[in-house]
Amino acid sequence: MRGIMKVFVLTGAGVSAESGLGTFRDKDGVWTKYDLNEVATPQGFARNPALVRDFYNARRANLAGARPNAAHDALAQLEAGLARRGGELFLCTQNVDDLHEKAGCRRVIHMHGELAVTRCHHCEATWPDTGPLKPDTVCAACARDGGARPHVVWFGEIPLFMDQIEDALSAADLFVSIGTSGSVYPAAGFVAEARAMGIATCEINLEPSANAYVFDEKVYGPATEVVPAWVERLLARL
């Protein structure tokens, strides 16, 4: 692992599951209880904004009580450890929670948006907001009401910061995917891009993902156990 100074880490729902935030695609996941077309699409919001707001208000309330776990803490330690060695961590998450930030990570790219941010459906203005979404919220930017929605990427919408993500991936020495299903694109394609550029790759997950066969190295087990151990090994080799 010597010579690795720029590490690109992609995290998914499996990182936050042990903090009490449910994953989406397992047998007990969020999408087994809700119709994603009704609560996670622009069309669903247009049809029934009250249902969508209720769904995300419940998720905000759940997030308010969540705390970072050992996997989040370890990634914050990795960021600090790389910085001390003159390296860099580029942390890109598919999660809409803020547990990486709460653990101390200074730079986090939320490609699917942030639950604790509200966006105006009318003008796209955003603002920090951990309270309940309300239909009568007036946007400070456009002075219209009725458009408050969570700042999350819904199905059919384009993920955020893709140019920045592609630049960071192309500059990386190591690509690591942690707690992802390997089935949500474009993120699921990052490992193939990394391999094509000759970048070392590693999957850390509870079990093999849909694209596990593409990775050079594989580490399996609960995130709170295997991520701290992997970070410790990596930093010891640098």
UniProtKB/Swiss-Prot annotation:
SUPFAM superfamilies: DHS-like NAD/FAD-binding domain. It comes from Caulobacter vibrioides (strain ATCC 19089 / CIP 103742 / CB 15) (Caulobacter crescentus). NAD-dependent lysine deacetylase and desuccinylase that specifically removes acetyl and succinyl groups on target proteins. Modulates the activities of several proteins which are inactive in their acylated form. Keywords: Cytoplasm, Metal-binding, NAD, Transferase, Zinc. The active site is at H112. The gene is cobB. NAD(+) binds at residues 12-31, 94-97, 179-181, 205-207, 223. Coiled coil: none annotated. Residues 1-237 form the Deacetylase sirtuin-type domain. 2 residues (Tyr-56 and Arg-59) present in a large hydrophobic pocket are probably involved in substrate specificity. They are important for desuccinylation activity, but dispensable for deacetylation activity. GO terms for molecular function: histone deacetylase activity, NAD-dependent; NAD+ binding; protein-malonyllysine demalonylase activity; protein-succinyllysine desuccinylase activity; zinc ion binding. This is NAD-dependent protein deacylase. Substrate binds at Y56, R59. Its EC number is 2.3.1.286. Belongs to the sirtuin family. Class III subfamily.
